């Protein structure tokens, strides 16, 4: 079990705003980590749903957010003493009366965590949250056999909804988007 710290250190988490783009991307763009969770546009777009906050601690960018009722953290991004920063996140979870949970941990991050704090974590894979990475040129043309299913899906959509249109997602449409997501979750059994 992880030891309990008596530290009074509080991580200065704050809400993400557009003004934080330079701070956040100064870490994420230098990182070799490439997943959608670190995209500034995703962080901003989903911040209201997950109550995502960030801080810079000991030259690491750290995030915490709520996944339903569970407080969760992302793997810190930066350089330096990762173990010390992890302990600070663990302590932050304790101060929130939550179990420490990290989401979005890839296999290379898992190896780092196991090397730094061996046998302290349980890892669970959920492919529903995996990133799928494609070349932009492949997605723009969808050429070849491997994209046949995607072409079929697009054609089925166009035939089913011939009058579809692109509209900007503005603040007055957010509730409509959330309602659509809730309806979709019910349809696939995740409500």
Task: Report residues per predicted region.
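Conserved small/polar residues in nucleotide/adenosyl-binding loops
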Residues: 1-4, 191
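Structured helix-beta-strand junction loops
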Residues: 27-31, 96, 160
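A broadly conserved amphipathic alpha-helix scaffold signal in soluble, globular proteins
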Residues: 87, 91, 107-114, 155-162, ...
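Short Lys/Arg-enriched alpha/beta "domain-start" segment
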Residues: 12-16, 20-31, 37
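Conserved donor-binding loop and adjoining core beta-sheet/short helix segment
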Residues: 26, 36-108, 113
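Acyltransferase donor/substrate-recognition loop-hinge adjacent to the catalytic core
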Residues: 119-189
């Amino acid at each position: 079990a992880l030891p309990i710290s008596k530290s009074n250190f509080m991580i200065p988490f704050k809400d993400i705003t557009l003004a934080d783009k330079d701070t956040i991307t100064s870490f994420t763009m230098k990182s070799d980590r490439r997943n959608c969770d670190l995209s500034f546009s995703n962080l901003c777009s989903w911040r209201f749903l997950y109550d995502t906050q960030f801080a810079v601690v000991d030259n690491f960018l750290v995030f915490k957010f709520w996944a339903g009722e569970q407080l969760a953290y992302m793997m810190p991004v930066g350089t330096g003493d990762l173990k010390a920063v992890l302990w600070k996140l663990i302590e932050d979870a304790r101060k929130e009366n939550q179990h420490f949970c990290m989401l979005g941990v890839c296999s290379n991050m898992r190896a780092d965590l196991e090397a730094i704090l061996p046998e302290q974590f349980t890892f669970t894979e959920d492919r529903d949250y995996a990133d799928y990475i494609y070349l932009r040129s492949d997605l723009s043309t969808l050429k070849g056999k491997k994209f046949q299913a995607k072409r079929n899906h697009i054609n089925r959509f166009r035939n089913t909804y011939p009058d579809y249109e692109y509209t900007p997602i503005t603040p007055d449409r957010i509730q409509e988007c959330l309602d659509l997501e809730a309806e979709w979750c019910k349809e696939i059994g995740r409500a």
